[in-house]
């Protein structure tokens, strides 16, 4: 969701609460439970899963490996669920022409620096940059170059769903709003 007026442009960012992250966290969790159940049933010698008789899988080495994969998958799945719960990467970009201030806010991982808040003046913005990489894994990222601070990404680096036209239009609108040039690299 975005909000725009004559002097203020606010762009809300979704973060890690995306449908794809929910899907992969569920798949990984269920698959890990399956691996762990197969490993446990081979250790106990009891048939915990009706599809696969436990007599066919020996505990050493197959059951140990299945248990290891199950535990590793549960750790990775818990990491995904934590990033979804904490909504890592969400936040907003606020461009205020009237006050001459740009604010960038993102939620990070819990800790001392959970809230990432950057604030600088509009006059310190040198340009809006577009990075385009075509090929098997195309990437189109929008950056803001700030005097003395380098470049700051405005779009997520994993968002490859922007068409060239969409990223150019977004860059042109933002550059016009802020009164800065566009660079492509």
Swiss-Prot record:
Disulfide bridge map: none
Q: Which domain of life is it from?
A: Eukaryota
- Provide the protein name: Photosystem I assembly protein Ycf4
Coiled-coil ranges per the record? none
> In which family does this protein belong, per the annotation?
Belongs to the Ycf4 family.
Q: What is its main location?
A: plastid
Q: Which UniProt keywords apply?
A: Chloroplast, Membrane, Photosynthesis, Plastid, Thylakoid, Transmembrane, Transmembrane helix
Q: Which residues cross the membrane?
A: 20-40, 57-77
Q: Which GO terms describe its biological process?
A: photosynthesis
Q: Which Pfam families match?
A: Ycf4 (PF02392)
- What organism, scientifically named, is this protein from? Sorghum bicolor (Sorghum)
Classify the protein's membrane topology as the record does.
Answer: Multi-pass membrane protein
Protein location = Plastid, Chloroplast thylakoid membrane
| Gene Ontology cellular component terms for the protein in this record | chloroplast thylakoid membrane; photosystem I
Q: What does this protein do?
A: Seems to be required for the assembly of the photosystem I complex.
């Amino acid at each position: 969701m975005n909000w725009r007026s004559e002097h203020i442009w606010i762009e809300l960012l979704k973060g890690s609460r995306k449908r794809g992250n929910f899907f992969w966290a569920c798949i990984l969790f269920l698959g890990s439970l399956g691996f762990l159940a197969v490993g446990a049933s081979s250790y106990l010698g009891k048939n915990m899963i009706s599809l696969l008789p436990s007599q066919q899988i020996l505990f050493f080495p197959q059951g140990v490996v299945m248990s290891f994969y199950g535990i590793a998958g549960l750790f990775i799945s818990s990491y995904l669920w934590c990033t979804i719960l904490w909504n890592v990467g969400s936040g907003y970009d606020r461009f205020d022409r009237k006050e001459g201030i740009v604010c960038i806010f993102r939620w990070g991982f819990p800790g001392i620096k959970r809230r990432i808040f950057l604030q600088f003046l509009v006059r310190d913005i040198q340009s809006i940059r577009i990075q385009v990489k075509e090929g098997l894994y195309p990437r189109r990222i929008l950056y803001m170059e700030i005097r003395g601070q380098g470049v700051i990404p405005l779009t997520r680096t994993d968002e490859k769903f922007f068409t060239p036209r969409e990223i150019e239009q977004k860059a042109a609108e933002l550059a016009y709003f802020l009164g800065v040039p566009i660079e492509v690299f």
